[in-house]
Design a protein with these regions (language model features):
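Extreme N-terminal tail/first-helix region
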Residues: 1-17
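Catalytic strand-loop segment that frames the active site of acyl-thioester-processing enzymes
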Residues: 12-45
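A generic structural signal for short beta-strands and their flanking turns/coil linkers
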Residues: 14-16, 26-28, 47, 68-74, ...
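Compact, glycine-rich, soluble single-domain proteins
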Residues: 39-59, 63
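Hydrophobic beta-strand-centered segment that forms part of the acyl-chain substrate-binding groove
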Residues: 59-89, 94
Length: 131
């Protein structure tokens, strides 16, 4: 995969161990493991971990064509608990985009079983190029 300046420099994603599996405009896959440090008080993956992975996948899917996209809003629905040590994949797709905005949908699921842990939606804004 060619480098993507905006996401290759994502220091939070690097700190959390997020991996870019695939990144093309319109579809991206990010992967991470729900390590012990990412668990909440009831010993399942913290919602912030899943949200951050989905947000990263959204960035991968919208920045892959060379434009700079930033999130202007996002929501998530948690559907089932994500256990410790689960390998999690966030698959982002873009059902709509134009020159200024893109809507991104992300399924967050077990890489092994396909069990869906959460669904995420975001609106991405493309920054204008300097005149």
């Amino acid at each position: 995969m060619p480098p993507i300046r905006n996401t290759d420099n994502d220091r939070l994603a690097k700190t959390l161990g997020f991996e870019c599996v695939q990144s093309t405009f319109g579809r991206a896959v990010a992967r991470a493991t729900a390590r012990d440090a990412f668990l909440n008080g009831v010993d399942i993956a913290h919602g912030g971990f899943l949200f951050s992975l989905a947000d990263y996948a959204s960035a991968l899917a919208t920045n892959a064509d060379g434009r700079t996209a930033i999130s202007s809003g996002a929501s998530i629905d948690y559907l089932s608990p994500c256990p410790k040590d689960a390998v999690v994949e966030a698959v982002a797709t873009i059902p709509y985009s134009d020159e200024r905005t893109a809507l991104c949908e992300v399924s967050i699921a077990s890489a092994e079983s396909g069990k869906v842990y959460a669904m995420f939606r975001s609106r991405m804004i493309f920054k204008k190029k300097p005149q």
